Amino acid sequence: MSPRTAAALRDGDRSLREHLIATAGALMAEEGAAKLTVRAIARRAGVADGVLYNHFADKEELLAHALRAHVRGAERALGDLPVAGDATVEANLRAHLAYGLALHRAILPTFAGLLAHPVVLTRFAALTPTNTEWRDRLLTYLHAERDLGRLSSTAHLDAAAALLVGACHETVFSALVPHAGPAPAPSLDDVVATVLEGIGA
């Protein structure tokens, strides 16, 4: 291992591969992904450019892993989601929506920067376990509340989840499209109240 590589791993027992992923993920969070280069990643990681290709088939593989690390880091920073049966459904949905908006604000700019790199997005999707994204967890929560009798037994939960996720998409995506101008963020209370009119017990 070269002195530069050794210096790059001073944080502990993390492998060089993990170090490169973490470094690329940090750069994504700070600067976006559109102009992220192998040289920039290597320089931040403290290694020679060619070292990256000892651990990844290509730049796209590294970026896919870095994107996953970026998303997981954003999720960890936001903390835990409400548990079905605790508090009130209204309060829990408000917490879910606030979480979704914060998550989208943290990660959608990075995804937007990768729209011209579909290979990275495809590989990211392959790395992501099923039923682990926020929408999946929201839907699981809604089903659990319905099973507890706190939502209508005939509630269309897929539609309710789509409304909540859609509110996040519109608010954040509109800010990323300069000619459209940002859409005003909807009131969390208004969105939750509208959803509960359709699915409340």
Positions of predicted regions on the chain:
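Helix-turn-helix
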Residues: 19, 23-61, 65
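Short, basic, alpha-helical segments at the C-terminal edge of helix-turn-helix-like DNA-binding modules
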Residues: 68-74
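Conserved hydrophobic residue
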Residues: 151-152
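Amphipathic alpha-helical packing segments from all-alpha helical-bundle domains
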Residues: 75, 103-113, 121-148, 158-162, ...
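Short, Lys/Arg-enriched anionic-surface-contact patches
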Residues: 9-16
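Hydrophobic alpha-helical connector segments
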Residues: 65, 79-106, 157-164, 188
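Helix-loop "lid/cap" segments that line or gate small-molecule binding pockets
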Residues: 82, 95-103, 111-120, 194-199
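C-terminal peripheral helix-coil segments that are non-catalytic and often amphipathic
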Residues: 1-4, 91, 95, 102, ...
